[in-house]
């Protein structure tokens, strides 16, 4: 299988369970990398029986219609910010965040506290943020969505924090995935805040580094800016992100952080992929997702060719037409 790097922990646990329940199935070495990288690898090699992405657009844009013709949205996570507690700015932000947890959401004081948090992260000249590349990792553009939504929510100006970070090259360090950013934080404190982070990765990663004696944590964000609440879909859509690199320009829609999965048309072992997804949709699998900060979408939502979904999976999914109020978080046209 090939899957978004932030699914590494949940999917590794599911693969271990798969080995237990299906001892006769040989499991190949999974590739956990940026969603775009994984999808392009499948388009080039057709080696995967399963491909999973951390957004709703990568699989359709890269694999439809020649390599896959549907995707199943199975979980939603939320953006968080990983904080280096070994730096003064990190300590200050964490202290303010704890204060915000005691304040009434949307009150004047709560708004002021969140403004102070983002001022430190985005405006202070001596802080540097870590972000991933929008072209290799969805969390790269999703981090930009968070900054724009924070500007809109707290400053009534979507560009306020985005400009402060992305218009100043010294303000951010960009890598292909958020895993690479954690290494930067750990090795030399060169970034104090990682904006390209999901709960699904922040929970196990911060635990791992804490066990190594490094003082880092993550802070959660309000639902109206964390891309983790489907009921805020219309607010998320008030902003979008345009990114240019090496002459290539792309505009990204700010959608909830939804994990999707497909079984490619040329899957070498389709039945093993079906069995994995049956495990994922089982009570055991759903608990594994929750353990890593992924809220299951039940039933799963099929975008694309519903009739191509294997029969065994049908009891656990519905076509997008059945939940049309969520259609705007998927690409505009079905294949």
Predicted regions mapped to residue ranges:
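Exported/periplasmic ABC-transporter solute-binding proteins
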Residues: 1-23, 31-44, 55-56, 63-64, ...
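Generic, well-ordered alpha-helical segments
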Residues: 34, 51-54, 73-74
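Residues embedded in well-ordered beta-strands
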Residues: 49, 73, 80-82, 260-262
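Acidic, Gly/Pro-rich loop/turn segments at junctions of secondary structure
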Residues: 51-68, 80
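Generic beta-strand structural signal
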Residues: 70, 79, 127-129
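Short, charge-rich binding segments
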Residues: 71-73, 120
């Amino acid at each position: 299988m090939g899957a978004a790097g932030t699914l590494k922990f949940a999917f590794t646990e599911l693969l271990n369970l798969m080995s237990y329940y299906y001892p006769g199935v040989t499991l190949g070495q999974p590739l956990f990398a940026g969603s775009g990288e994984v999808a392009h690898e499948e388009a080039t090699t057709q080696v995967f029986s399963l491909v999973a992405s951390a957004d709703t657009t990568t699989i359709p844009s890269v694999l439809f219609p020649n390599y896959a013709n549907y995707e199943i949205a199975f979980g939603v996570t939320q953006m968080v910010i990983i904080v280096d507690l070994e730096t003064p700015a990190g300590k200050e932000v964490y202290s303010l965040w704890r204060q915000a947890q005691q304040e009434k959401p949307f009150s004047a004081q709560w708004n002021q506290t969140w403004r102070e948090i983002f001022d430190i992260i985005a405006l202070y000249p001596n802080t540097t943020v870590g972000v991933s590349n929008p072209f290799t990792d969805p969390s790269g553009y999703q981090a930009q969505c968070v900054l724009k939504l924070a500007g809109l929510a707290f400053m009534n100006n979507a560009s306020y924090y985005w400009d402060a970070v992305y218009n100043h090259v010294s303000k951010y360090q960009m890598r292909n995935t958020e895993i690479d950013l954690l290494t930067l934080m750990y090795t030399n404190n060169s970034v104090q805040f990682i904006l390209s982070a999901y709960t699904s990765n922040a929970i196990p990663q911060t635990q791992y580094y804490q066990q190594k004696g490094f003082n880092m944590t993550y802070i959660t964000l309000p639902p109206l800016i964390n891309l983790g609440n489907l009921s805020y879909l219309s607010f998320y859509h008030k902003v979008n992100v345009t990114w240019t690199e090496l002459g290539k320009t792309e505009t990204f829609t700010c959608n909830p952080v939804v994990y999707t999965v497909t079984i490619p048309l040329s899957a070498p072992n389709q039945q093993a992929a079906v069995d994995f997804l049956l495990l994922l949709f089982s009570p055991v699998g759903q608990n594994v997702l929750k353990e890593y900060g992924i809220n299951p979408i039940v039933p799963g939502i099929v975008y694309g060719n519903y009739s191509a979904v294997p029969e065994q999976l049908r009891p656990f999914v519905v076509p997008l037409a059945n939940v049309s109020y969520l259609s705007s978080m998927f690409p505009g046209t079905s294949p």
